Each structure stands twice: as C-alpha cells, then as structure tokens.
Amino acid sequence: SDVYKRQIKSEQFIRDERNEFYNEFDKSFLKLFPHFITSFNNLLVEEARVYPKSDELLTTELRIFALIRLGVVDSNKIAHFLGYSLATIYNYRSRMRNKAAGDKDRFEQDVMNL
C-alpha cells in the first residue's frame, strides 16, 4: 500500500511538473509572439478557431503549432517535448491542416511565417 501511495504521489508530481513546464513555455512563447493566437486563428476557417480556456495560456493545438512556429517540425521531437504519443501529434497536425482557410499544403509553412 505504501508503494502504491508513493507511485500515485510520483505520478501526481510528474503531472504537476509538466503543467508548470507548459505554463512557463506558454508565457515565454506569448512574450515573444504576443499576437500568435490571433494570427494562427486567421489561418483557420472561422468555426475551427482555437481559443484557450480562461485558466490556460495555450491549448494543446496551439502549443504544438507554437513549436512549429519556433522551427520544431519533427513530430517525434514535438511528441517527446510535450509528453504526447506520436499518433496524438500526427492527429492534431492533420486535424488543424484540414481546417486551414487557405492552402492546406502550405498551412504549416504559413504558421512558420507568423
């Protein structure tokens, strides 16, 4: 039972650390690119636009594309950096690309130019 409690505490600690990391990443990124969310949303069809909840700075989608904006385009690296599976990153990337207002094949290039 003690081992189990330690395991749960450890998992909670990792979750808390990851959330703290996300928060610091988001704040730093938005300091560098204060108009990123608006500019990113302008690349999407209106009904697909992404808005963070009041308690978060960036959503998972926005965080993935923030990394792409910074030049991290390898899905493996993005998955490792954010602690998601490769399949999750592929799904997010393809879902957002399909919601592009303009040329879907240029979507990620357009993000890099924001």
Predicted regions located by residue number:
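Signal-transducing coiled-coil linker helices
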Residues: 14-21
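Cytosolic nucleotide-binding catalytic cores of signal-transduction proteins
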Residues: 23-114
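Short, small-residue-biased leader/transition segments that mark boundaries at the very start
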Residues: 3-4
